[in-house]
Swiss-Prot record:
Keyword line: Chloroplast, Plastid, Transit peptide
Keyword Chloroplast: yes
Subcellular location(s) of the protein: Plastid, Chloroplast
Compositional bias per record (Low complexity), positions renumbered to this chain: 19-37
UniProt keyword Chloroplast, yes or no: yes
Gene this chain is encoded by: ERD7
InterPro entries named in the record: Senescence/spartin_C (IPR009686), Spartin-like (IPR045036)
Annotated protein name in UniProt: Protein EARLY-RESPONSIVE TO DEHYDRATION 7, chloroplastic
Main localization, broad class: plastid
Length: 452
């Protein structure tokens, strides 16, 4: 028979000592070691009524979605010219890359780059044209002239020529790359105002070698070296200079149609495939002579130098926006950034749907660039890869002087984390876009158009 003491220790209930009723109850006493109910500290409960969620507390609410850069197409053997009727200057030679910047689930911007030297955005109000199997040209409005830029002061136009178009002529050594050109044209259809315009057969026959497309078409990227490269480059320069009046005329008319929302361009209405005889004579003469450095310098018109400066600004602007997005400086969500929504951007912005390119207009791209530049004008750094010596060797001192003006054509990168941090402070990610702001801007735009 068990003793009464054994019954007490095996009891399910704690033993209460009644010998001293005024003594405090000790919750940690040995009598409660077998208690089925857990002990609770009321102080802990009071302090942790709303515990933090560890999986979300470390992420700030205003953090922008991650941005990534994707190379969706790469074509070797690309030569890029600045189309000019006095002398088309070669800007870059190397690989053509089409780069897509994605932030979250949205395609924020699509950029074209040649040899990592010249970049420009592909946008829905930018004209891209296929002329033949190896030649394409792109039309861009140059960025807003900056009043404090020394190159503007030397221009003497006070920024009045900011609406003058930049026309880039792209030549591709297309032998063996025909399938890549098909992909390129699909991308241009998706992200720009793409059309196909051809030179008339009469002009091709009269132009002899100057408009001959077989030189580039029958050259592969591997063969684009040495003497063969010089032949192709000379032919490309003559080709684009000969077609310059046609390209400039078409670009001006096409830009007006795109700005008014006229949609796709109809072949034959704007493009004049016939090349004037004086242009053909000039082009054929150019093909027959080899220009020395001094002769090249004499061919560069002062207006061409101004356009070269605008090319540099276009590259700077494109890299500024791209690096700002990738650095988390610029958060894009929904349709547009607030810097775009708060300006008079025009009705074409508001016809876009979610999922399309957010920076779908070059106007929008320019305004985003302005916001980035204001925030980080004094902290951004420049990295140069195109040297004055190279340009001086190819095009003479005047072109080299233009290349040395302002920021270099090849470099405008943020580069360091502290720079990105400073600009992130200046542009508040919380105020990226308010739907009410977008709606009010759309209403004001529609009202102004109705009054007009």
């Amino acid at each position: 028979m068990e003793s009464s003491g054994d019954k007490q220790t095996s009891s399910l209930y704690p033993t209460v000592d009644t010998s001293n009723p005024e003594a405090p109850i000790n919750p940690s006493s040995s009598s409660s070691t077998n208690n089925l109910y857990p002990s609770l500290d009321m102080n802990d409960l009071a302090r942790n009524l709303f515990p933090e969620q560890p999986e979300t507390s470390s992420i700030p609410v205003s953090a922008p979605p991650a941005a990534t850069e994707e190379v969706i197409l790469k074509i070797s053997g690309a030569i890029l010219h600045l189309i000019d009727k006095s002398y088309s200057v070669e800007l870059a030679c190397g690989d053509l890359e089409i780069i897509r910047i994605v932030q979250g689930e949205n395609v924020v911007a699509v950029l074209a780059s040649v040899s990592d030297e010249i970049q420009w955005p592909l946008t829905k109000d930018e004209n891209s044209v296929k002329v033949d199997e190896s030649h394409y040209f792109f039309t861009l409005r140059p960025t807003k002239e900056i009043s404090h830029d020394s190159s503007d002061e030397e221009d003497g136009d006070g920024g009045k020529n900011t609406n003058e178009m930049l026309n880039y002529g792209l030549t591709i050594a297309s032998k063996g790359q025909e399938h890549l050109l098909v992909e390129l044209e699909k991308i241009l259809e998706d992200y720009s105002s793409f059309s196909v315009q051809e030179v008339s057969e009469e002009a091709k026959e009269a132009g002899e070698k100057v408009l001959d497309v077989t030189v580039a078409r029958e050259t592969s990227p591997v063969e684009l070296t040495g003497e063969r490269k010089e032949i192709v480059e000379r032919q490309c320069s003559a080709y684009w200079t000969t077609l310059a009046p046609n390209v400039e005329d078409y670009s001006g008319k096409a830009a007006k149609l795109i700005a008014t929302g006229s949609g796709h361009l109809i072949k034959g209405i704007l493009w004049c495939g016939d090349v004037t005889m004086d242009r053909l004579i000039w082009g054929n003469g150019f093909m027959k002579r080899r220009l020395s450095k001094a002769e090249k310098e004499s061919e560069v018109h002062p207006d061409t130098l101004k356009r070269i400066r605008r090319v540099k600004r276009m590259t700077k602007m494109t890299e500024s926006v791209a690096n700002s997005i990738l650095s988390g400086v610029l958060k894009v969500s929904g349709f547009f950034t607030s810097s775009v929504a708060n300006t008079k951007v025009g009705k074409k912005f508001f016809s876009l749907l979610p999922g399309e390119v957010i920076l779908a207009s070059l106007d929008g791209f320019n305004k985003v660039c302005d916001a980035v530049e204001v925030a980080g004008r004094n902290v951004m750094s420049t990295s140069s890869t195109v040297t004055t010596e190279l340009v001086d060797h190819k095009y003479g001192g005047k072109a080299a002087e233009a290349t040395n003006e302002g920021l270099d054509a090849a470099g405008y990168a943020l580069g360091t984390a502290w720079v990105a941090f400073k600009i992130r402070k200046a542009i508040n990610p919380k105020s990226v876009l308010k739907p009410s702001t977008l709606a009010k801007t759309a209403i004001r735009s529609a009202a102004s158009q109705k009054k007009a």
